[in-house]
A protein has these predicted regions:
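A charge-rich, low-complexity, intrinsically flexible signal that marks solvent-exposed coils, linkers
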Residues: 1-105
Length: 105
């Protein structure tokens, strides 16, 4: 194997790792978002956990975050506006990445 082959394999492995980490972070963010929204909806315990799973599943409808936003926004109605939800999504993505990194160490 040449140095170029080694380098190519390293780049492919890094790309796959980064994609996996991003997927895990977004799934974790969606779960945290679901738990946050469930609290606003007055759900607790198993009902809140089930709602969080619904939010995670909503992300598989299309690429990007719009499907998750639509789900949460539609469910919350006037309990949270667009800016609040989108800001919470960004905050929770940072939190999710930090949680995942702390689990790796």
């Amino acid at each position: 194997m040449t140095t170029f082959d080694d380098r190519e394999n390293a780049f492919e492995n890094k790309f796959a790792h980064d994609a996996e980490m991003q997927f895990k972070a977004e799934a974790r963010r969606n779960k945290l978002l679901g738990l946050w929204a469930a609290e606003l909806l007055g759900k607790t315990g198993d009902e809140a956990a089930a709602y969080a799973v619904e939010v995670v599943k909503s992300d598989f409808e299309e690429a990007g975050d719009e499907d998750v936003y639509r789900k949460v926004s539609g469910d919350l109605g006037d309990k949270a506006d667009e800016i609040t939800i989108r800001t919470k999504m960004r905050e929770l993505l940072v939190e999710a990445k930090a949680q995942i990194m702390s689990e790796i160490k």
